[in-house]
Amino acid sequence: MKIFIIISLILTILIIQSKSKECPCSNVELCKPLEIGPRKEFIGFSVNSTFYPYYNWDHLTTIGIFYSEDIEDELLCMAKTNGVRLVYSAFYPVEQLSNETYIDQWINEKLELVQNTFTDGLNFDVEYPITDPIVAQQYTQLVAATNNAFKSVNLYYQISVDVAWDASNCIDYRCYDYLGLSKASDFLVVMDYDMKLDGYYFKTCLASANSPPSSVLSGMVNFTKLGIDESSLVMGLPWYGYNYPCIGSNYTLQTFECIIPPSSYLGYNCTDASGIEINYSIIMNMLNDTAIQNGGVQWDSESESPYFNFIDLFSGTQHQMWFDNPDSLTIKVNIARTMNLRGVGVWNIDQLWDDHSLSSGMWGALNSFFKIN
């Protein structure tokens, strides 16, 4: 989830008129909060208000709204018909965590928004560095207060929290109270992507996988070591990749190592900031574009992830694309199934367009979480 999207969303939400509109569905029962208890989850994060006709509804349970436009009436009715919750992303300014007046107003505004738009809850997406244990506790208290306020109105409202991929090492300086957050909410969505953070002293940076299964597994295990129940953990996975420029000229389209420019982030030298995020549909179109020279999709057995080299049309230089496909996603979904996690999720479900041949495998990989042994 990207901060610039969240900031835009919160500014828009705060100016939404408080007047409730009439139910747009032919069946007015669909405008009531979904009365569905705890279940296995497939949460899809949406950044586009118009792509919902392309969704696969077979196992989708929750859609996280990360755009500023109003929710389409058709989407609302379609989601509720399929038993899918709609929840708003919720960004909260860390500097206001000790301001009780601000907190009360914020919670009331969010509750009013959800009630007036016939939706089903909030997804907290606070990704700021927090290293002070007192501030971390204040964040937990905010989530708990929000959850209590929502549940006092309707027990079926859903409150979830997005967290970094590993709870043990203060990833991105997010030293949150993860156990407390898991108890204060319905579940945590572990963002198992953007994992490329290589050491402080690396002299040579190499392109690499966005979401290696070994790191996904170790991160999840570390959450459980804190005492967090597996039923409170949802594995969030990427439907996108990173396009990295390769420095130098001694490359072929079959070269494995791609040296990339250093890109400092929170003290790390080698991060995915050296690349450009590319959605899955565009990646597939690039592979099928005869004007783009590429070496074909390769498989890195160590990171269990696909990649390919190509010649950039604009610069004429070699690039390397690391991404996820149905094969790599299935490996991680199997980890979620084996660990008996609460569910899986995707950032974001608007990465696939109307080409069924491209999208069916990606949806199928996530839907495999629900298969019966």
UniProtKB/Swiss-Prot annotation:
Domain GH18: 21-369
Molecular function in Gene Ontology: chitin binding; hydrolase activity, acting on glycosyl bonds
GO biological process, one term: oligosaccharide catabolic process
Subcellular location: Lysosome
InterPro entries: Chitinase_II/V-like_cat (IPR011583), Chitinase_insertion_sf (IPR029070), DIAC_cat (IPR047898), GH18_Domain-Containing (IPR051887), Glyco_hydro18_cat (IPR001223), Glycoside_hydrolase_SF (IPR017853)
Documented EC number(s): 3.2.1.-
Pfam families documented for this protein: Glyco_hydro_18
UniProt cross-references to CDD domains, sorted A to Z: GH18_chitobiase (cd02875)
Source superkingdom: Eukaryota
Broad enzyme group: hydrolase
Catalytic residues of the enzyme: 127 (proton donor)
CC per GO annotation: lysosome
Positions that bind chitin: 53-54, 82-85, 128, 191-194, 347
Record keywords: Glycoprotein, Glycosidase, Hydrolase, Lysosome, Signal
Role summary: Involved in the degradation of asparagine-linked glycoproteins. May hydrolyze of N-acetyl-beta-D-glucosamine (1-4)N-acetylglucosamine chitobiose core from the reducing end of the bond.
Protein name, per record: Probable di-N-acetylchitobiase 1
Protein's organism: Dictyostelium discoideum
Lineage: Eukaryota, Amoebozoa, Evosea, Eumycetozoa, Dictyostelia
Gene: ctbs1
